[in-house]
Curated annotation (Swiss-Prot):
This is Translation initiation factor IF-2. Residues 258-267, 340-363 have a biased composition (Polar residues). Residues 600-607 are annotated as: G1. Residues 625-629 are annotated as: G2. Transmembrane segments: none annotated. One of its GO terms (molecular function) is translation initiation factor activity. Residues 737-739 are annotated as: G5. Belongs to the TRAFAC class translation factor GTPase superfamily. Classic translation factor GTPase family. IF-2 subfamily. It comes from Chloroherpeton thalassium (strain ATCC 35110 / GB-78). NCBIfam families: IF-2, small_GTP.
Length: 1097
């Protein structure tokens, strides 16, 4: 990876807004260049220039031109494929169609010549759904040249000519039209030629006068099907699109007077034609188009057939109609006869005109629209139903005499109805008598008519119910809409409130200054947004003198921030130099192996359990049989499932290691010996797991021992808040024997189940900057600094630059726990990395960096912050403090230099030594380091009067000779509790001894002798003990001490003696004191020094 890279300062989303191009298009273009992008990706100036060149206006025009040209060629090819096979078929059928045209014209004229007899009534096709009167809507003639018509359109138009009147015309396929890619003229001419051959034009000119239009509208009320020249019910809708794409429908309705077999056949053929593929539509259309102008039956036959059908219906309805209404029916029939006559005249005119049009041989294949007429638009009256049509027929065929008898009845009924029904709406004259007749017929005929009326009432009730439901639904919709409006208002107010809160939070956050402790004046000024001069002036006003590069303490930073109206939030060096990274993409996230930490008290079998799982013997390699290092191991099961295990020490001195293990793990296995109790380190491990919110699986070990009691362990765990599943809790528990392997496989299965529930995922993208944690670090003589890293996200390869705490470097090699070289490491995999410039601390974050320069900058900044922190917090001895300590003689200090094999061991030793010190004796670690003891360490110990503790390390040859010369005490240890014991004893020896007073003799004064030149001599008797000549004594009178001193002389008889035992008499004098009396007591005593014990609080 190059050391220098061009700075990325242009976001893709900003470039997309600038060019007015979709962000996805920009991303796809950049990815084609070989870059991996997201919505927040930044690019360099060179990449931005490439994007601008690609999406410039000239580039857009050229791309659009290419796209239009490709679309044009594609459509031309598609049209050629469609037209070529159809043209061959139509050319073959053209000759056959012309031959049949002459014969069909003759037949059509022969069948259309007979006119309708005057004496015959209008033919009526009685049907449940009466047909609409003949109506032809023709769109206005378009003078523009016809658009190219595809073969499918020709077939579709031909098919429309033979469909029944009430059936909608088959949809026509719009011609292929694209403003961007026009067809060449040669292709258009060929398409038009084929279309003209396949669909000859039929010219229809209808120009009815306004009076005729009104007659047609009036005829709709009593519409009756009439004879037709055609044998089919035809309905055609033709759409012609102009350049403006405006389409107007052309509809032709022709009433049908019969239902012939040809009509059924044509309808079936039309249905089949719609289901067939487009390639077969044109052939089917030609077959259907041919019989269009042929009329198989004459109008007279149609009328005869309609009359017979009419008589049958009339006989059925005549039985249920009242005879007393005949007169009213006759009056209404006169109006119907007039309307029928006008309707028949119009129909005859249209039939003659249509037959003339079909007489031309060129019109035999279809229709062509030349214009459109607009009929008089007004509200049409209601169509008569089947019963009303039957009533009209009966009135026409009923004799006149019954009609005259019933005339008075008709005159009286309207008068009776007008009074109660004055406020009601007026009904049609033909509909109301029928309803009255039905009501009266129900009363006269009884149940027979009631049966027919019930469905009518049920329909009415249904309509009412439907109207009620619609009204209720409308009301509900209104209520729902009002409720939705209220909800929208509430939601809007909530959004506004949230926006106000966010704005306030942002404003408050903008006034919070996040800074590290011991920042320089220049750095503080940059974060405050002011010049360093202003900061220095503020400090001058506050009475402090600082420089621009001076490091400021915590109090000064807080004071200056308040002066500039800022709040201060102090952060660590790692947070200050945190590296921003792109968010993880869902496609990059994959399931990762779980990380399992084994925790528990010392000697409960943690490492033995791991040895059984790994099929190794780690315990044999540990000094004293206890774990003193934090190990990371990867285990592969039989099903290729991978697990990562972290083995933590159980000794109380390794608290930091256990806390570190709980923070980076996914699952904790808590090992408790069944033959022991829940120990303090067990409780500590549980607290670490709870603090890290990590699930716990309890493993009760050593169940193979005779004195094992798993139930006692469960009880003790429940007392401290860990309730296992067997007792109704949520913590899994498994009884195992790490020595024999009993239950170990079940324990692993429970770990896998717990990991599956956690849904552990990590980013496996190679573009992701990897992250990890330093588990342990050591200094090897041949390899240099080696750190054990647990990868958390991303993929690590050899040669990548990195930073870990205050150390940086480039990966030179990667090793697994067995020393095998690795080229690539994935998430949740432990690895030993070589290439650190300095020794990192256990627990530091390991981060892959884009370049060596960035890694070095971050590492140097962290080192400055840490050095300043150590310097400011180092203990400084003042002269007054030294004088006070000398006067009191209480405080003793043991200076220590610690050298160990790993950084974790150093931390454990330092923490352990801090715990054994007291207020009178203290331990000061003046230097700590990883690696062997060097000459520098010896010189430092000689200058500071310190001892050197080597934990699993040895001095080099020169250091050993220098230590012997300077008489420096170097202690070597391999087990941590041996170090702590010796330091404990040394601190006890440094304690001042405890002084205790012991009474050696009690002497009673019985007589006093006065001797010249000597003074008063006391004659005494030794009551208890033995009084010595050198003993200190005190004189007690009535229990009150009046003198304390030494003896001046001690004699027995006349001889000087050194001591007098109990029960003997003696004489004594007190030095410089003569005020003695009879019965005074003299006590001799001595002070005894007692060695003190070091009591650690």
């Amino acid at each position: 990876m190059p050391a220098e890279k061009e700075k990325k300062k242009h976001k893709l989303i900003d470039i997309a807004v600038e060019l007015q191009v979709s962000l996805d298009d920009i991303r796809s273009f950049v990815e084609e260049l070989g870059y991996r992008t997201t919505n927040s990706t930044k690019v360099t100036d060179s990449v931005k220039e490439l994007i601008l060149d690609n999406y410039s206006d000239e580039k857009k025009k050229s791309d659009l031109h290419k796209k239009l040209k490709a679309e044009k060629n594609r459509k031309i090819q598609l049209l050629e494929k469609r037209v070529s096979p159809q043209a061959d078929k139509f050319s073959k059928k053209k000759t056959a169609a012309k031959k049949e045209a002459s014969q069909e014209k003759a037949d059509a004229h022969a069948k259309l010549e007979p006119s309708i007899p005057e004496e015959a009534p209008a033919a009526i096709d009685i049907d449940d759904t009466p047909e609409v009167a003949p109506e032809i809507e023709i769109p206005s003639q378009n003078t523009q040249e016809p658009e190219p018509v595809e073969m499918d359109e020709v077939a579709s138009a031909a098919t429309l000519a033979v469909e029944e009147a009430p059936i909608a015309a088959a949809p026509t396929e719009e011609p292929m039209h694209n403003s961007e890619a026009e067809l060449p003229e040669s292709k258009i001419d060929s398409a038009e030629a084929v279309a003209e051959e396949a669909a000859p034009e039929v010219e229809v000119h209808l120009e009815p006068k306004e009076q005729e239009v009104q007659e047609l509208n009036h005829a709709e009320e009593a519409e009756t099907p009439t004879t037709e020249a055609s044998s089919e019910e035809t309905s055609a809708v033709m759409t012609k699109e102009g350049d403006s794409n405006d389409a107007q429908p052309f509809t032709q309705h022709e009433p049908v007077s019969r239902k012939t077999q040809n009509t059924t056949n044509v309808s079936e053929e039309n249905k089949q034609h719609e289901k067939q593929p487009e390639t077969l539509k044109s052939d089917k259309a030609m077959d259907v188009v041919q019989p269009v102008p042929i009329a198989e039956e004459t109008a007279e036959q149609q009328l005869t057939e309609a009359s017979s059908y009419e008589k049958k219906e009339t006989n059925l309805q005549g039985e249920n109609l009242e005879t007393n209404e005949a007169d009213a029916a006759q009056t209404e029939a006169k109006d119907d006869d007039a309307q029928s006559d006008s309707l028949q005249a119009e129909i005859s005119r249209q039939q003659n005109e249509i037959s003339n049009r079909f007489s031309q041989s060129e019109n035999i294949a279809g229709l062509k629209v030349f214009g459109e007429i607009e009929l008089h638009k007004k509200k049409r009256k209601r169509k008569k139903n089947f019963r009303e049509q039957a009533k009209d027929l009966k009135q026409q065929m009923t004799p006149e005499q019954p009609k005259q008898e019933e005339k008075p009845v008709k005159k009286e009924k309207p008068k009776e109805r007008e009074k109660p029904a004055a406020g009601k709406k007026e009904q049609t004259p033909g509909k109301k008598p029928v309803r009255e007749d039905q009501k009266e017929r129900v009363l006269q005929d009884g149940p027979a008519r009631v049966i027919k009326k019930k469905p009518k009432k049920a329909v009415d009730e249904k309509v009412v119910d439907r109207n009620i439901r619609q009204t209720m639904m409308t009301m509900d919709d209104t209520n729902d809409s009002s409720a939705r409006q209220k909800f929208r208002k509430i939601r809007k107010r909530e959004r506004l409130r949230e926006q106000e809160i966010e704005a306030a939070a942002k404003e408050a956050e903008s006034k919070v200054l996040k800074i590290t402790e011991f920042a320089s004046t220049h750095e503080l000024a940059d974060m405050l947004g002011v010049t360093p001069k202003e900061v220095i002036q503020k400090c001058f006003k506050l009475g402090k003198f600082i420089t621009i590069n001076q490091r400021l303490d915590k109090e000064t930073i807080e004071l200056l921030s308040l002066e500039f109206n800022y709040e201060v939030h102090f952060i660590s060096d790692v947070e200050a130099t945190e590296i921003d990274d792109d968010p993880d993409l869902p496609e990059d996230m994959k399931t990762r192996p779980p990380v399992v930490t084994i925790m528990g008290h010392v000697d409960h079998g943690k490492t033995s359990l791991l040895d059984y799982i790994r099929n190794s013997n780690v315990v044999a390699g540990e000094s004293g049989g206890i774990t003193q290092h934090m190990g990371a191991y990867e285990v592969t099961l039989e099903n290729k499932q991978r697990l990562t295990f972290l083995d933590t020490p159980g000794h109380e001195a390794f608290t930091a290691m256990r806390a570190r293990g709980a923070q980076v793990t996914d699952v904790v296995i808590l090992v408790v010996a069944a033959d022991d109790n829940v120990m303090p380190q067990t409780v500590e491990a549980i607290n670490h797991a709870k603090a890290a919110e990590v699930p716990i699986i309890v493993a009760i070990n050593k169940i193979d021992k005779p004195d094992a009691n798993p139930e006692k362990i469960r009880t003790q765990l429940a007392d401290i808040g860990v309730l296992v599943e067997d007792w109704g809790g949520s913590v899994q528990c498994q009884e195992i024997s790490a020595k024999k392997g009993t239950g170990v496989r079940d324990l692993i299965d429970k770990v896998l189940v717990e990991a599956e529930l956690l849904e552990l995922k990590a980013n496996y993208s190679e573009d992701k900057l990897s992250r990890g944690v330093v588990i342990e670090a050591e200094l090897d003589k041949g390899k240099g600094v080696i750190a054990t890293i647990l990868v958390q996200t991303g993929i690590i390869n050899v040669g990548m630059p990195f930073v870990a705490g205050g150390s940086s470097g480039r990966i030179r090699a990667m090793l697994d726990e067995r020393g095998n070289r690795l080229e690539t490491v994935y998430p949740s995999q432990p690895v030993r990395i070589l290439g650190f410039e300095e020794l990192p601390q256990a627990g530091d974050l390991f981060s892959i960096m884009p370049s060596d320069r960035e890694a070095r900058e971050i590492a140097q900044r962290r080192q400055v912050i840490r050095r300043e922190h150590e310097f400011r917090h180092s203990s400084r001895v003042k002269l007054n403090d030294i004088a006070k300590q000398v006067q009191e003689g209480q405080v003793q200090e043991l200076r220590v230099i610690i050298k160990a094999d790993t950084d974790g061991s150093i931390q454990a030793l330092a923490d352990g030594l801090m715990k054994v010190q007291t207020d009178e004796v203290k331990v000061e670690v003046i230097h700590r380091g990883v690696g062997q003891i060097t000459e520098t360490d010896v010189l430092l110990a000689a200058a500071s009067d310190a001892i050197i503790i080597g934990f699993r390390v040895r001095p080099n040859v020169n250091a050993k000779k220098l230590a012997e010369k300077e008489e420096i005490d170097i202690r070597f240890y391999s087990v941590i509790y041996h170090v702590l014991e010796d330091i404990h004893d040394a601190l006890e020896g440094m304690l001042s001894p405890e002084l205790q007073e012991k009474v050696t003799a009690t002497v009673e004064i019985r007589d006093i002798f006065r001797i010249s030149k000597i003074g008063n001599v006391a004659g005494c008797h030794v009551l208890d003990g033995k009084i010595n000549r050198d003993s200190r004594v005190r004189l007690l009178r009535d229990g009150i001490q009046i003198y304390e001193g030494v003896l001046d002389s001690l004699k027995r008889h006349k001889d000087d003696v050194k001591e007098v035992d109990s029960g003997y008499d003696c004489g004594l004098t007190l030095k410089n004191y003569d005020d003695i009396k009879v019965n005074d007591i003299v006590e001799s005593f001595e002070t005894v020094e007692t060695k003190r014990k070091l009591v650690v609080s």
